[in-house]
Amino acid sequence: MSANGAVWGRVRSRLRAFPERLAACGAEAAAYGRCVQASTAPGGRLSKDFCAREFEALRSCFAAAAKKTLEGGC
């Protein structure tokens, strides 16, 4: 039972660190948001993959943040 508690302790600490790590992706999130907003504005040209470059940058940043969280690094 104590081993199970140790596992949950590690999981909780990783989950607590995750929002801080995602905060480092603010520039990517803002760029993606601007792209989506521009494409849905009047006269915008919303189409599949229109913001793919911005989305990929955001996804990569989130993946890097998740990896750091799982590794327990800074």
Curated annotation (Swiss-Prot):
Its main location: mitochondrion. A motif (Cx9C motif 2) lies at residues 51-61. A motif (Cx9C motif 1) lies at residues 25-35. Residues 22-69 form the CHCH domain. The keyword Repeat does not apply. One of its GO terms (cellular component) is mitochondrial matrix. It is found in: Mitochondrion. GO terms for biological process: mitochondrial respiratory chain complex I assembly. Disulfide bonds join C25-C61, C35-C51. PROSITE patterns: CHCH. Keywords: Disease variant, Disulfide bond, Mitochondrion, Primary mitochondrial disease. Coiled coil: none annotated. Interacts with NDUFAF5. Involved in the assembly of mitochondrial NADH:ubiquinone oxidoreductase complex (complex I, MT-ND1). Required to stabilize NDUFAF5. It is linked to Mitochondrial complex I deficiency, nuclear type 34: A form of mitochondrial complex I deficiency, the most common biochemical signature of mitochondrial disorders, a group of highly heterogeneous conditions characterized by defective oxidative phosphorylation, which collectively affects 1 in 5-10000 live births. Clinical disorders have variable severity, ranging from lethal neonatal disease to adult-onset neurodegenerative disorders. This is NADH dehydrogenase [ubiquinone] 1 alpha subcomplex assembly factor 8.
